[in-house]
Design a protein with these regions (language model features):
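Aromatic-glycine-rich donor-binding/catalytic loop that engages nucleotide-sugar donors
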Residues: 117-134, 143-154
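Acidic donor-binding segment of Leloir-type glycosyltransferases
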Residues: 20-52
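C-terminal catalytic/acceptor-binding lobe
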Residues: 138-212
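Glycine-rich, basic loop-to-helix element that forms the pyrophosphate-binding segment
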Residues: 53-70, 110
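Short, well-formed alpha-helical segments that are part of the catalytic scaffolds
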Residues: 7-23
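Short beta-strand-to-loop acidic/aromatic patch adjacent to the donor-nucleotide binding site
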Residues: 73-84
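Acidic donor-binding/catalytic loop of UDP-sugar-dependent glycosyltransferases
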Residues: 82-95
Length: 212
C-alpha cells in the first residue's frame, strides 16, 4: 500500500500514525513545514519517502502532488497525519473501488480516504484555489456527485485528533480565522455559479491566504 500524508506540524502525531500502520506500506510524507525533520519511527512494515518543501503547499495542492507523484496507481490512499489506525483499517481501505471516492463513515469523513483513477479521469484533481485548507473536500465531493460517481463510506475504526494543526499553533489559528472565511466564499461562489470545474492555482490567492 502507498499512503500519502501531508504534514505541517505535530510530527509526534505523524509518528503515532506511522506506528499504527499494520500492513506493508510506503508512506509518502509531504512535509509542508519548511524544515527538515529528524523523524524516528518503530514499524518494520513501513518504508518512508519524504518530500521536503520550502513552503506550505496547502491541502489541495499536497493531495494533488501525491496523485501526480504516483500516476500509475488505480487508487490513491490519502490520510491525515493526526490519524491513528485501528487494526484492520488499512486492509478495509485497500478494498476501495477505482471508480469511487471512499471516505470514513464518521466525521470528519475525509480524515482518511481513497480516490479511484476513474474519478480523477472524469472529475480532475482538487481545486488548488482553495488554500491552504478547508472546503477542498466539500468542493470535490460536490463535483464527484455531479459526475454521477459513487461516494462510499467505509467503517474505519481509526481515531483522529481533529484540527490538531491549528489548535497547536496560535498563528495558524489566527490565520485560519481569515482564510476559512475566504475559502468559504470561494466555494459558495462556485456553488452559486453552478461551477463544477477543477479550478486553478492563483498566485494572488496563494499569497493572500498564506500561513507561511
Amino acid at each position: 500500500m502507498k499512503l500519502i500524508v501531508p504534514v505541517l506540524n505535530r510530527f509526534d502525531l505523524l509518528t503515532r500514525m506511522v506506528n499504527s500502520v499494520d500492513v506493508e506500506a510506503t508512506v509518502y510524507v509531504i512535509n509542508n513545514s519548511g524544515v527538515r525533520q529528524d523523524f524516528v519511527y518503530d514499524n518494520a512494515l513501513v518504508n518512508m519517502h519524504w518530500v521536503d518543501l520550502p513552503s506550505n503547499l496547502g491541502v489541495a495542492s499536497s493531495w494533488n502532488l501525491g496523485i501526480k507523484m504516483l500516476p500509475f496507481e488505480s487508487r490513491w490512499f490519502i490520510t491525515s497525519a493526526d490519524t491513528c489506525f485501528a487494526p484492520g483499517d488499512l486492509s478495509l481501505l485497500d478494498s476501495a473501488r477505482d471508480d469511487a471516492v471512499s471516505l470514513c463513515s464518521v466525521f470528519p469523513y475525509w480524515q482518511t480516504f481513497a480516490v479511484g483513477q476513474r474519478v480523477v479521469e472524469q472529475v480532475g484533481l482538487f481545486d488548488e484555489g482553495l488554500h491552504p485548507i478547508y472546503f477542498e473536500d466539500n468542493d470535490y465531493e460536490r463535483r464527484v456527485a455531479n459526475a454521477g460517481l459513487p461516494i462510499v463510506k467505509l467503517d474505519l475504526a481509526l481515531t483522529h485528533d481533529n484540527s490538531s494543526t491549528i489548535n497547536s499553533n496560535i498563528r495558524f489559528g489566527a490565520r485560519n480565522n481569515v482564510t476559512f472565511v475566504d475559502n468559504q466564499k470561494y466555494f459558495a461562489d462556485k456553488v452559486e455559479a453552478d461551477n463544477f470545474g477543477q479550478g486553478v492555482w492563483s498566485l494572488l490567492r496563494r499569497r493572500n491566504n498564506s500561513w507561511d
